């Protein structure tokens, strides 16, 4: 799973719990999150996932943003591959405000399901 924004809100916690449950069941679970887009993702949530066997990695952590151009080099992908046969991709991040509507104006991001050879 790869996402620009993963928030520590109701939606983020629900997804984290699903990932934790799957990792504890023996499935291979990997999460890549953007270090800037997901800056509100807590160490506590990351630690809980890690302790359950979820592999997590931050994309391009920024240590000193005023000394680097890496702060604008971000990963905006939103991809989930479930089993090598089904994947989801699109513009929806993992955050409650994607369901609430007017948080940042009126917009509608979409995700789509892909199956078959295109997933592999």
Which stretches of residues belong to each language-model region?
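HKD-type phospholipase D/PLD-like phosphodiesterase module
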Residues: 2-120
